[in-house]
Each structure stands twice: as C-alpha cells, then as structure tokens.
C-alpha cells in the first residue's frame, strides 16, 4: 500500500469519515469536520503508525492531508 493510502486510512478511521473524503486538498477542520482535539489525536495516531515525532510547531502548520503526506515523506527516513 502506498504512503498516501496508509495515511488516508489512519485519517478516515480517526475522524470517522469516508476514505474518499480524505483527499490531499482536504482540510481537517473545514472539510473533514475535525475539532482541535481531533487534530491532536490524529497527529498522535500518525506518529504511532509511522514511528515519527511531529513537534508541536510543525503540527500547527499541518492543516490538510497533503501537509501530512509531505511531512511524513520528508521525515520518515530521516
């Protein structure tokens, strides 16, 4: 499974939305109905799934699915 599909599955499960709604452009709050607690829990789930740490200052910059994909691509192998 490609990285995007892995991320898409985590987001869909965490936010209880259909995976088809989880597009690179989808914003967590505006498009997927997440609140601030949902976003924190989502970041934690992504950290656990991919074995990475997303510092708070970086997490604040992640507003859509594409941001997550880029961050994980850039940091997963670091």
From Swiss-Prot:
Keywords: Cytoplasm, Fatty acid biosynthesis, Fatty acid metabolism, Lipid biosynthesis, Lipid metabolism, Phosphopantetheine, Phosphoprotein. Pathway: Lipid metabolism; fatty acid biosynthesis. Residues 1-76 form the Carrier domain. GO terms for molecular function: acyl binding; acyl carrier activity; phosphopantetheine binding. Belongs to the acyl carrier protein (ACP) family. The modification O-(pantetheine 4'-phosphoryl)serine is found at residue 36. It is found in: Cytoplasm. This is Acyl carrier protein. Pfam families: PP-binding. SUPFAM superfamilies: ACP-like (SSF47336). The keyword Metal-binding does not apply. Its main location: cytoplasm. The keyword Phosphoprotein applies. Carrier of the growing fatty acid chain in fatty acid biosynthesis. InterPro entries: ACP, ACP-like_sf, PKS_PP-bd, PP-bd_ACP, Ppantetheine_attach_site. The gene is acpP. One of its GO terms (biological process) is lipid A biosynthetic process. It comes from the Bacteria. 4'-phosphopantetheine is transferred from CoA to a specific serine of apo-ACP by AcpS. This modification is essential for activity because fatty acids are bound in thioester linkage to the sulfhydryl of the prosthetic group. One of its GO terms (cellular component) is cytosol.
């Amino acid at each position: 499974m490609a990285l995007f599909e892995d991320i898409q599955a985590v987001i869909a499960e965490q936010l209880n939305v259909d995976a088809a709604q989880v597009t690179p452009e989808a914003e967590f709050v505006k498009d997927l109905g997440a609140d601030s607690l949902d976003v924190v829990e989502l970041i934690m789930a992504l950290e656990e799934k991919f074995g990475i740490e997303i510092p708070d200052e970086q997490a604040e910059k992640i507003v859509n699915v594409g941001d997550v994909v880029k961050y994980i691509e850039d940091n997963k192998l670091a």
